[in-house]
UniProtKB/Swiss-Prot annotation:
Its cofactor is Mg(2+). This is ATP phosphoribosyltransferase. It catalyses: 1-(5-phospho-beta-D-ribosyl)-ATP + diphosphate = 5-phospho-alpha-D-ribose 1-diphosphate + ATP. CDD domains: PBP2_HisGL3 (cd13593). Its main location: cytoplasm. PANTHER family: ATP PHOSPHORIBOSYLTRANSFERASE, ATP PHOSPHORIBOSYLTRANSFERASE ATP-PRTASE. It is found in: Cytoplasm. It comes from Bradyrhizobium sp. (strain BTAi1 / ATCC BAA-1182).
Length: 325
């Protein structure tokens, strides 16, 4: 008998709250079996699923080992801690929270340094004058090396940072930094600026799958159910349901509505009584309502959608293709 599908989610703070809210919106209620301090949990209604509450960095390492099947973690941690990440894990879907950029930041006083090419010149000159390489404080060692190599920068050395990286230039432990930032305000408060082409990675929380986990039939079916929930909720969030009834609707009018407003008719054209159901992007609701009334509709109703379940699930299809490759 195969073991459970193990899903790792952040164990504390805003990331945990956002992850639980994300699953909750998809109809997947997470709960800790032993109370708030427990690090194991369940999803209501799914007996073959175990939730593991871990730090975001631990989630990335456990995905690399294949100790968990799915995990919620930042792309920055995946790219930094997992060599050849695209071969070992699959970023199934972005989750819309935890957004931040990994950036190269230099002192604002370096007024002539705006690009990575400028930085290359500065690092070369610095080594010639001081007989040692310029120091870069960061916890993103692998991302820094790859990005600097792509820009041909070699005259630097990394100073590994455990925390408060943005303060390193001010206290004299480094000349510049590579760090993660959401708004840039902390960098600015420490007298730093992001280079114009210095964004290494635009990161956010992702749902990630491990290739090396045990993907036997039980865990695979549980993953299909979870991804079905997630896709159904994501599809529903893109539309509102519009319903009306009138005799003047035909294929040409539906084609025009699709082209002008991006609507789809999930159940085909109108019924014999003239009933018509459309899915419409929220921003186009009023325009579509005006269009339908101009063509003869007396009443147009609009409702929110909780879930839209399609025959095919592109999220699970991506996972299946990844595991087969």
């Amino acid at each position: 008998m195969s073991g459970p599908l193990v899903v790792a989610v952040p164990s504390k703070g805003r990331l945990q709250e956002n992850a639980e809210a994300f699953f909750g919106r998809a109809g997947l209620t997470l709960s800790k079996t032993g109370g708030a301090r427990d690090y194991r949990g369940t999803i209501s209604g799914l007996d073959n699923v175990e939730i593991a509450y871990l730090s975001a960095s631990e989630i990335a390492s456990q995905l690399a080992r294949g100790s968990v099947h799915l995990g919620v973690t930042g792309e920055d941690l995946v790219r930094e801690s997992i060599p050849d990440a695209d071969k070992r894990v699959l970023l199934i879907d972005t989750l819309g929270f935890g957004g931040a950029n990994v950036v190269v930041a230099v002192p604002q006083a370096w007024i002539d340094v705006r690009t990575m090419a400028d930085l290359d010149d500065v690092t070369t000159g610095f080594r010639a004058r001081h007989n040692h390489r310029m120091r870069v404080a960061t916890k993103y060692i692998n991302l820094t090396r790859s990005f600097f190599a792509a820009h041909g920068i070699v005259d630097y050395r990394i100073v590994e940072s455990a925390g408060a990286t943005e303060g390193a230039p001010a206290v004299g432990t480094a000349e510049l930094i590579v760090d993660i930032t959401s708004t840039g305000s902390t960098l600015a408060a420490n007298g730093l600026k992001v280079l114009d082409d210095g964004v290494i990675l635009r990161s956010q929380a992702n749902l990630v799958a491990s290739r090396d986990a045990d993907w036997s039939d039980g865990p695979r079916e549980s993953a299909r159910i979870i991804l079905d929930h997630i896709h159904a909720r994501a599809r529903a969030s893109k539309y509102r349901e519009v319903r009306t009834r009138f005799k003047g609707c035909d294929a040409a009018m539906l084609t025009e509505a699709h082209n002008r407003f991006g609507v789809v008719a999930p159940f085909g054209g109108p019924t014999s009584s003239g009933m018509l159901t459309l899915h419409c992007p929220p921003a186009q609701i009023y325009a579509l309502g005006s269009f339908l009334r101009a063509h003869g509709a007396e009443t147009v109703s609009v409702a929110s959608l909780d879930y839209v379940l399609d025959r095919e699930n592109p999220l699970f299809a991506r996972l299946e293709a990844f595991l087969r490759s």
